[in-house]
Amino acid sequence: MKRNHTRTKRTVAALALAAATAVGLSACMPPGYYGASGTLDNGDQKSMHVVVFNGWDEDTAASYLWKHVLEEKGYDVQLTNSDVAPAYSGLASGDYDVVFDTWLPNTHKQYMDTYGKQLTDLGSWNEQASLELAVPEYSGIDSIDELKAHASEFGNKIIGIEPAAGETKVVSDQVIPQYGLDGMDFITSSTPAMLADLKASIAKKEDVVVTLWRPHWAYDAFPIKDLKDPKGALGKNEEIHTIAKKSIEDDFPTASKWMSDFSMDSDTLYSLENALVNSGAKTSEYPAITAKWASEHQDYVDSLTSTK
């Protein structure tokens, strides 16, 4: 009996210790953490996988912002960079949960046509988006229809971004043939390379024409202007949408509601883009930079998860 009594006391003590440990751990967990089951107390899965388009700075800004916001709420958020086509394929298959940079109705139409039935559109967060051909303010032309006659002044080159980008297809399939620019070389590589070329040309006060888009921090950083597009080859103004996997509202009922209410004007976006992309910081420094920016824009950040 004594041995059994001792065992009982040890069992009670062990259970008490386990309970105390659980309470102690829960006190240390981020708000919303539920436990090891992989879910939060708001009904959402704990882990979210965000895909980020290579070279799209507004996507980088929005993705790091939401990573910060969600991790403050107890989520684990993984960001993965990808070219556009495999990003949509990954969303359709459920390998990724969400992307914050789908331009509609034009730029990413082909991907929505292909995968739209396997995706969920959580709505637009910026309605001031547009594709542009931009030149330095000192350039002597103001419209794309003047570019052919002045092509030699621009080295017979249009400097583009990633080959798989939606804007690249628009320029190649619409702008170049409509304005008779087939005699110019359309150079594609990456957004950082395009921006480096733009910066170097302006430093030398040389003419250069680049593919660009609004909103983008380059408009604050460089003396540039958009060329008028009288033929409308670049398309009308667009909206930036948050597109997610089909099951997003089942897997993340709370976060998907926050994201469907997400809104960010261009000035606020420029501010975060400048802090991240135009600061010369390493990617590893982006979380800390975003946290600092968030503390300086706390009312806005808090509004992203407020009940509306």
Residues of each region from the PLM?
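Short, well-ordered beta-strand elements
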Residues: 43-58, 75-80, 155-159, 259
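C-terminal motif of bacterial Sec signal peptides marking the signal peptidase cleavage site
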Residues: 21-27
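Bacterial signal peptide processing site
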Residues: 29-32
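An extracytoplasmic/periplasmic, membrane-proximal ligand-sensing/linker region
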Residues: 45-48, 58, 174-184, 188-205, ...
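A conserved helix-loop-strand patch within extracytoplasmic ligand-binding domains
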Residues: 117-164
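Ligand-binding pocket segment of bilobal, Venus flytrap-like solute-binding proteins
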Residues: 96, 100, 170-232
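A bilobed periplasmic-binding-protein/Venus flytrap-type ligand-binding module shared by bacterial periplasmic
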Residues: 130-140, 238-253
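Short helix-initiation/N-cap motifs at beta->coil->alpha
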Residues: 54-57, 78-90, 186-197
